[in-house]
Amino acid sequence: MIKVLHVYPKNDSLTTRFIHLLMDRIESKATSNADEFKRLCREWQPDIIHQHGSVDIKRHADARWVVSPNGLQSSFDDCYAVIARSHLEADALRDLGGKRIEVIMNPLVTKQVDIDETAKKMMKVYQKVMNSCPYDLFDEATKTSLPVILKAGIHGDKRWVEHEIPIPSITQPRQLFIFASLEGICPLLDKGLSVLGMTPLPHEPFECYLPENYAIPSSTEGANIVNMLDDIHRHGITFIRLVNIYQALISDSHDDEELLDKVEENDYNELFVSVLQIIKEQLHLDEGFFPCAPENNSLTKKLRADLQNHLRL
């Protein structure tokens, strides 16, 4: 269940009526009081806060924010979604630089829609919000399990991860599937789960919000490591690229000394040792496959942050 907290201005009877109609169809809570808002955030810990119009409250960092401007003029850059009441309002918000704008009409204002249709569309937006940036929603068990599953998938043999199993049960299969799909590693994750004898992930269609110009990365398996480092340098770090480098390092098709010479020729020494450190952390590559020692330096810190943030809006 998605926990939605509506917050709205006092003395706005139309918005109050609209929210209560939604609450009859979508399980949620609502308040127009700043103190009650703080209490609900602390005690109930909502997944989504849906702001309706202008409210005098401080942002709650742990929840995902959706806003219905109701006439407010802003780009709302820090919101997951902006809900316009009409296509005209949506166009005006886009002119202000708004993104992730959805049009959901208010049945109290227009007869073009009814409340059931409106509630269904609203719930779809809430689900898209919760499908977005899935890594941020991972619990510690999922974060612990992911490298082991991927490593088992890469090697195709659970003996490579015997000292790390049993791993925690997958309690977030949907989030894990969405994450793997967006990172281009779903087939590998499926293989790892099969190797470990774990329950397959449900392959269900989903919609989510993505950063502008984001494209699901594709595998470059078979490419040489220097080319993959060049790809990271130009386009940023991704899980699939780490997997591809891991696969290349454990293959018999390269010579460590020759590889290090090519890395140096292309001025990728610092990048390479940092990428090795990330592979060690994220995929548990065994030390025997390292052609040189990984390093945890300032570039590693940046790459680590980029890997966690590149799906964020």
Residues covered by each model-derived region:
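Conserved NTP-donor binding/palm subdomain of two-metal-ion nucleotidyltransferases/polymerases, i.e.
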Residues: K128-L313
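A short, active-site helix/loop in glycosyltransferases that binds the activated sugar's phosphate group
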Residues: Y80-I101
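An amphipathic, basic-hydrophobic alpha-helix
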Residues: T31-Q51
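Short beta-strand->alpha-helix junction loop in the catalytic core
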Residues: I104-V113, M123, I245
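N-terminal subdomain of nucleotide-sugar transferases
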Residues: M1-S32
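C-terminal alpha-helical cap of glycosyltransferases
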Residues: D114-D136
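A conserved, positively charged/aromatic
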Residues: C41, V66-A84
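Short His-centered aromatic/hydrophobic patch
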Residues: Q51-D56, P69-N70
